[in-house]
Amino acid sequence: IPYSTLEEYWHSFNNVYVLVYPPDKEPTVRDILGDHWDVETNRQLALDKYQAQIQSNPEDAFAWFNLGTNLVYFEHYQEAAQAYDRARELGLPQRMLRYQFGPFFAYFHTRRIDDLMALTEYALQITPNAEEALLWQGWGYYRAGDTNSAIASFQAALAENSNYLDAQYALDFVR
């Protein structure tokens, strides 16, 4: 596919990439990536990129979503929640919460439990067995003081994926 098409589709995934290379090629890969080799620098450059994209196109929902994702990485949850709010206002495809969970983190850490629960309900309507959405639903219940429902959600997440360590941690934490 042409690079322009790849770039267009990749945009909705925060331009995340995974490096796969033989260990003896690490110096070459480091040279190719330059400043992007360092994870913190890479994330800061991504944050800067999406801030600039929003300046040039404030109606780009993916840029707002990606800004939120990078703000979550730096634990700037309040700003991240605001970026996700804007992305949601502009409209996102249903699939956005299948593999990207930044909004759950942002709303949880800003104690916006109603928003967290609304998002998890939305995600579970699309994919009823999504263990990540079940996990965050459980954390929402926990923050709301409903420990029994939290445990049920964490157990449901583990029923979907018995190796889901985050759900096991959550279950152990609330018990």
Question: What are the residue ranges of the model-derived segments?
Answer:
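Alpha-helical adaptor scaffolds
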Residues: 69-75, 85-139
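A conserved position within tetratricopeptide repeats
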Residues: 51-55, 81, 88-89, 124, ...
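Noncatalytic regulatory segments and standalone regulatory/sensor domains
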Residues: 1-70, 74, 79, 85-87
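Terminal, low-structured helical/coil segments at or just beyond the last alpha-helical repeat
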Residues: 149-175
